[in-house]
Amino acid sequence: MKVKICGVTHPDDAWEAAKAGADYVGMIFAKDSQRCVTKETAKCIVEAIRDGGSEPVGVFSEHSIGEIIAISSATGITSIQLSGRNIDFKFSQLRELFSIFYVVSVYSNGQPSAAIPPMSNTVTVIYDHIGGERGTPFDWRAFSPFQHDNWMLGGGVNPGNVGEAVRLLSPRGIDVSSGVERPGVLRKDVTLMQALIDSAKGVGNLTS
């Protein structure tokens, strides 16, 4: 069971996530996100987790291919998350350069908004509640993932419901952002991160 702590905005939070057992730490570069980070901050986050066992992931949406390559090169990021318009074209151009997380938006009723292109299991598909950063889950009981084994569940996961999510859907991983933040605070909470990671990995080990 893999866990990705996304929307990290501070190097200290990244270090705490790594120490808690996060497999991935995500940094958002989308300018319309309240968790958007600068290249300078992202570089500090990458440095903070260099020896902590977590892999840094750059989260991109409406960026051009050139921008994605430039930002990743400047910050030391080798894994990227793609979403938004022209995702399939960007995926086809970048799949040989980076480890890729491919986002599929899911409607509230549990129906994916689009199909996925052919891809190997080295690509991680993330199913996220449409719109992103909602903090609420889509209908897990009505949801059925595509025929692609390597996938993560995102959107509305938190320490209180992650066990149910893992038991119900058996994802390969969990992607969480606001679910490990206190209300009104855009910093990650150490206690919430540890609780979510322990629960996800504990239940995941029992169901695998």
UniProtKB/Swiss-Prot annotation:
> Does Isomerase count among this protein's keywords?
yes
Decide whether keyword Isomerase is in the record. Answer: yes
For this protein, the record's PANTHER family field holds: N-(5'-PHOSPHORIBOSYL)ANTHRANILATE ISOMERASE
One GO MF term attached to the UniProt entry: phosphoribosylanthranilate isomerase activity
Which InterPro entries does the UniProt entry name for this protein? Aldolase_TIM, PRAI_dom, RibuloseP-bd_barrel, TrpF_fam
UniProt keyword annotations, A-Z: Amino-acid biosynthesis, Aromatic amino acid biosynthesis, Isomerase, Tryptophan biosynthesis
Chemical reaction(s) catalysed: N-(5-phospho-beta-D-ribosyl)anthranilate = 1-(2-carboxyphenylamino)-1-deoxy-D-ribulose 5-phosphate
The pathway entry for this protein reads as: Amino-acid biosynthesis; L-tryptophan biosynthesis; L-tryptophan from chorismate: step 3/5
State its Enzyme Commission number(s): 5.3.1.24
- Which HAMAP family does the entry mention? PRAI
- The positions making up the signal sequence are none
A Pfam family (short name) is PRAI
What domain of life does the UniProt record list for this protein's source? Bacteria
Protein name per Swiss-Prot or TrEMBL: N-(5'-phosphoribosyl)anthranilate isomerase
Q: Which family does it belong to?
A: Belongs to the TrpF family.
UniProt xrefs under Gene3D superfamilies: Aldolase class I (3.20.20.70)
Q: Which enzyme class, named as a word?
A: isomerase
> Taxonomic lineage of this organism?
Bacteria, Pseudomonadati, Chlamydiota, Chlamydiia, Chlamydiales
Q: Which GO terms describe its biological process?
A: L-tryptophan biosynthetic process
